[in-house]
Amino acid sequence: MEHKNIGAEVLQDTYDDQQKWVLDSSLDSRGRVPLRARTGAWRAALFIIAIEFSERLSYFGLATNLVVYLTTILNQDLKMAIRNVNYWSGVTTLMPLLGGFIADAYLGRYATVLVATTIYLMGLVLLTMSWFIPGLKPCHQEVCVEPRKAHEVAFFIAIYLISIGTGGHKPSLESFGADQFDDDHVEERKMKMSFFNWWNVSLCAGILTAVTAVAYIEDRVGWGVAGIILTVVMAISLIIFFIGKPFYRYRTPSGSPLTPILQVFVAAIAKRNLPYPSDPSLLHEVSKTEFTSGRLLCHTEHLKFLDKAAIIEDKNPLALEKQSPWRLLTLTKVEETKLIINVIPIWFSTLAFGICATQASTFFIKQAITMDRHIGGFTVPPASMFTLTALTLIISLTVYEKLLVPLLRSITRNQRGINILQRIGTGMIFSLITMIIAALVEKQRLDRTNNNKPMSVIWLAPQFMVIGFADAFTLVGLQEYFYHQVPDSMRSLGIAFYLSVIGAASFLNNLLITAVDTLAENFSGKSWFGKDLNSSRLDRFYWFLAGVIAANICVFVIVAKRCPYKSVQPSQGLS
């Protein structure tokens, strides 16, 4: 009985420690174990969400009107403008792969956010200067046709500085925000599930403000005034983020995340001829008390050949300590390598969705320019059509969080309602519907080009709204999937993987436009992409994309069914 009482007391002490302290290897601002009541959770996340709002405000204030700027101020033709938008969008959303790597391996997420946001701010300052300094200002449209070279150079340097800033800001900030919630604490784990939804509500609020207030200022007042506003808001949010420093929980960078992956492959190949042990528990693993830099993972049968990296050749404790990490690795390191391999097919099978998403900021906006934008006595700025997407996203996320998740949870017994990959797949179906609607509307618009009165821009409302539903399911699902399904030490890179879907899709979109354009000219003698929309056949391109997405959904279903989820060993307090 005494032994049982002692055991119960130890468990109670462990539980009490978990309630008081955060024991997930994070640190407070002074390098100590964080006190749960004073750090992290929503008290810290709100500071982080504030800077995300301002970053999305700045990004979409520029991105949604970029094609308009290139075709009107810089006088680029449609194909050149779309290519430049896609190149910039591609670089902006691929740069997080580098930023996430630097954050996880060397600088840490907090420091990376500070450095990246400073670079972002430099880009905004240069952009604003290019509209006010006489030597850099664009020439007036009525005075000259050719754009002023100095302005063009300053403009592109500025927007690519913003790309570099986004590269460090986006993956680090979102993963830093999620780090404020302890996965081993029941209440905080529930909060974390809500965090990604409310993160996206804040993101949408930034987008909504950008495509209404900022777009109106750019359209009616001037790009320079809009630049001043965006620069000031970003500077204020950086100060707010810095003020939250005492409340944050920090994770120390763990070195290059690529080295352990390479070590697993080298060790598995070196021991390829050894037999598998009779029981997975015989594979090399450290105890929970020894492992303080993260969480231990459970063994999975998937990619079993990599298990050989954890086969113990000499069970002598002294020999184990001296064993090279290129010869023997823990089971957790092996499972982390499997996780990286698992996300690769998911990444590829979501690229078609990314291609659909890129249309909203390019061709959808260009369609709006050619249509009647008068509603009552008000002229709608083209970029303000994104208001419908942002509102749909906010409403659908709120309904999903407050109504659908509790309902689905009671049916499926899954804390998320449905699993992450099911959520992603649902959004892909909405993206298919978006392309079908867009094709039908564009055909209707082309049929009316000979009429004196153009179609109302309201006809574009359905495609802007349905893509909002697609984003609510797929984009948010991708954020959760890549954050949770990569090793804990690679979470900034995990967010970068999600962003890189859009980045790679932007470049693929350019390749598709070029390939489809060439094929159309060879077979029919007429390009699908003329100098303007009225001389193009954008409806056919949309039907082509609908076919690509439909085929991709079938591939995604097959991949998703075979893809296992991360399996974490319960902590001592929870077990």
Curated annotation (Swiss-Prot):
The modification Phosphothreonine is found at T112. Expressed in stems, shoots, leaves, flowers and siliques. The keyword Oxidoreductase does not apply. Gene3D superfamilies: MFS general substrate transporter like domains. GO terms for molecular function: dipeptide transmembrane transporter activity; tripeptide transmembrane transporter activity. CDD domains: MFS_NPF5. InterPro entries: MFS_trans_sf, NRT1/PTR, POT_fam, PTR2_symporter_CS. GO terms for cellular component: membrane. It comes from the Eukaryota. The chain crosses the membrane at residues 44-64, 88-108, 113-133, 153-173, 195-215, 223-243, 339-359, 375-395, 420-440, 457-477, 493-513, 541-561. Keywords: Membrane, Phosphoprotein, Transmembrane, Transmembrane helix, Transport. It is a multi-pass membrane protein. It is found in: Membrane. Belongs to the major facilitator superfamily. Proton-dependent oligopeptide transporter (POT/PTR) (TC 2.A.17) family. This is Protein NRT1/ PTR FAMILY 5.6. The gene is NPF5.6.
